[in-house]
Amino acid sequence: MIKFKLILIFFLFIVSTTYASVARPFDFRKWNFKKDIDLAYVLMHDLDNGILIKSQDKAGSIKSQEVLTKLNALNAYCNNLQRIIKAKLVRGRFQKEVELPLLKIIRKYKYLTRNYKNKSLIENPEYTKLIAERIIKKALFLENYFQSNRLKNVKSGENIKKRISDNQSKLKSLRSKPNKSVGSKFSKNSRPSKSPQGVKKCNKRRILDKYDLNGAESEFLDDPSQESDELEREYQDDELESEDPDDGEREYQDDRESRDDTFNEDQSEDEFFDSLEDQFI
């Protein structure tokens, strides 16, 4: 019983630490960070004969530590979300859907803060506001992506490779099967059609009697079905020769090549984002 309790406590501890790593540190959507930064700056300084000096009051340092603690917690929250999303996505998709939008946010605020000479937090309130705004936008983007359906429908790289190999094996099995449908199709439908009803049949016996050709009848009509059977066989052979049995094979080969091309396009896209990552890092 004691062992069971220890195992249960250990399991709950692991679950709590796992979910705590992605839990919101505070409601940053409603945080009026500009007001807190201005208040911390005012409390940290006093006016002495028109000169701004640092205050000896501890209220300013307490307020500034509160602002810095929130910024650090929010930054850690962003890093945890980014790590979890990266573990669930393949490399190319993570770079395309997550890293590049984050790089745009970082570049924007890097451009806005480029002219500030004093880059000390709280000491320069305007610079601190831009840094806080950048971290909040980054957290909002990662949080929205983490909660979106795009992350729920992600397939791992192993499943993708397995699906590709299954499709290739199916194509190979289809190519190896003989095309039996061609022979069966023409064996059923290759018989000569019946004569139309509007045409009168020729009375061959009367014509032979008229021209005294009864003796030659046996010569021409020994096997009346032999010539028709030979013609039917020749017709079937001609039709089978005209039908290309490799059409199905070419169709499956074209389909396979198109899938390979798609797959090659995805690989080149990964190489493109790899080069972008090398430029930005």
UniProtKB/Swiss-Prot annotation:
It comes from the Bacteria. Residues 162-281 are annotated as: Disordered. Residues 250-262 have a biased composition (Basic and acidic residues). Keywords: Cell outer membrane, Membrane, Plasmid. It is found in: Cell outer membrane. One of its GO terms (cellular component) is cell outer membrane. It is a peripheral membrane protein. Residues 219-249, 263-281 have a biased composition (Acidic residues). Residues 179-196 have a biased composition (Polar residues). This is Putative outer membrane protein BBA52. It comes from Borreliella burgdorferi (strain ATCC 35210 / DSM 4680 / CIP 102532 / B31) (Borrelia burgdorferi). The lineage of its organism: Bacteria, Pseudomonadati, Spirochaetota, Spirochaetia, Spirochaetales.
